Amino acid sequence: MNKILLQCDNLCKRYQEGSVQTDVLHNVSFSVGEGEMMAIVGSSGSGKSTLLHLLGGLDTPTSGDVIFNGQPMSKLSSAAKAELRNQKLGFIYQFHHLLPDFTALENVAMPLLIGKKKPAEINSCALEMLKAVGLEHRANHRPSELSGGERQRVAIARALVNNPRLVLADEPTGNLDARNADSIFQLLGELNRLQGTAFLVVTHDLQLAKRMSRQLEMRDGRLTAELSLMGAE
């Protein structure tokens, strides 16, 4: 078994508005190994996106903890969490969230700029990542000049440019047609093999989830089962 990279210990999340309490996550526990490709499957409102926010240190659990590479996130300062997100984690969303006034190359380079890399390294690494997703010829195009599939590929390149150990993906193909969705998942698998990057994908789509090596099901804020989807149609 691969070394554990990320571990969730009894994560709970409760939101309170006035006298109204809403429990979104209930004692969620699981782990992700180094280089593992995992899917969490659930319908809209099951708590998947909230879980990803906690895993990425974008929100704080009501109770429980997230442990990344042996380090509890509850012990990290806000600055340390930001550094972790920049250096060790990648994020892919259903919507690409590219900066509209910047080129594909500049969008991919943004995490490197934030990480204060050297200018020459920034350009070469960003261009190499665009090449890895098959878009080096679109480096100087803005998002409005790219197709939906191309924009999502740029977003994936941006998520991977710092060579993160884990990528958290929230419905990464939700806005794509079947052909582009298939292409994106082939790309994730290739990057996993070449770079050893671990992927945790949340989705409602069983056809996409079965491409991962492991699948968990989430219902009403609880992990309810480990699925076996290899033969799913």
Swiss-Prot record:
ATP binds at G42, S43, S44, G45, S46, G47, K48, S49. SMART domains: AAA. One of its GO terms (biological process) is protein localization to outer membrane. InterPro entries: AAA+_ATPase, ABC_transporter-like_ATP-bd, ABC_transporter-like_CS, ABC_transpr_LolD-like, LolD_lipo_ATP-bd, MacB-like_ATP-bd, P-loop_NTPase. One of its GO terms (molecular function) is ATP binding. It is a peripheral membrane protein. Gene3D superfamilies: P-loop containing nucleotide triphosphate hydrolases. Its EC number is 7.6.2.-. Disulfide bonds: none annotated. CDD domains: ABC_MJ0796_LolCDE_FtsE. Keywords: ATP-binding, Cell inner membrane, Cell membrane, Membrane, Nucleotide-binding, Translocase, Transport. Coiled coil: none annotated. Residues 6-233 form the ABC transporter domain. GO terms for cellular component: plasma membrane. It is found in: Cell inner membrane. Its main location: membrane. The keyword Transport applies. Belongs to the ABC transporter superfamily. Lipoprotein translocase (TC 3.A.1.125) family. The complex is composed of two ATP-binding proteins (LolD) and two transmembrane proteins (LolC and LolE). Part of the ABC transporter complex LolCDE involved in the translocation of mature outer membrane-directed lipoproteins, from the inner membrane to the periplasmic chaperone, LolA. Responsible for the formation of the LolA-lipoprotein complex in an ATP-dependent manner. This is Lipoprotein-releasing system ATP-binding protein LolD.
